[in-house]
Amino acid sequence: MLVSIVIPCYNSEHSIKKTVELTVEEFKKLPGYECEFVLVNDYSKDGTFASIKELCGKYPFVKGINLSRNFGQHNAIMAGLNYAEGDYIIGMDDDLQTHPSQIPKLIGKIEEGYDLVFGHFGETKFGFFKKLTSKIASFLTWHMIKRPKGIQASNFWICQKFVRDEIVQYKNYNLYLQVLFYRTTSNIANVEIEHFAREEGKSNYTFKKLLALWLSCLNYTVVPLRLATLLGGICAAGGVVGAVAVFVRKLLNPGIPVGWASLMCVLF
């Protein structure tokens, strides 16, 4: 069985080689499974694509994609999914925090009959800022896009081929990958995995990038529209009540200057 591993790469010229090599070694321990890699360089500022080309020359099962500018992690993954041909598709990071040694747990869980499995980190090695932003993202996906109850999403996942086939039909730019997963299937599970510390460098997610990602959630929900409708209804009702109050006051107090009541009604 072929397993495609899609990795978005950004400024990872040193870690991507080790990530691929450790994954290759891990698959040697899994009889009946083969792997292919789709490495997507998201316009890195270092020699990441040179490392990808070197890996392509070393391994015939490695595909390299070089994006013309920085499109962001989710768009980079989508680009890679278009070239993934496996029966299962795994998404993971390039920094070894989503460690290849945990892949057998993902495969074992999806073999139980699930369409999509997210790795759930029992204890994370993230810093305070990353933990905070992850909690915000969880809140948004739960309350705005109806994430299945009890499911913890992460960047380490495995899905069936039909899930990939459905997702790649989405052609818009501002995408939030997890939402597309939730729209495709509800047969989702978690499996607890170990989260490893970053071996070098720091997270490439700035607050600006995270904010843009969160705002992309608005493309998939009617919650803002419902809130705007509710607010509009409240304002309209308040205006009617105010106009009635002004009209009644005018009737009870004819001495109010001419034009005041009509002006107040217009303002309400």
Which role fits each region the language model picked out?
Residues N41-A50, L96-Q97:
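A conserved acidic beta->alpha catalytic loop
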Residues P31-Y43, I65-N66:
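Short beta-strand/loop segment that forms part of the nucleotide-sugar
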Residues H14-K18, D46-L55:
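Acidic helix N-cap motif at the loop->helix transition within catalytic regions
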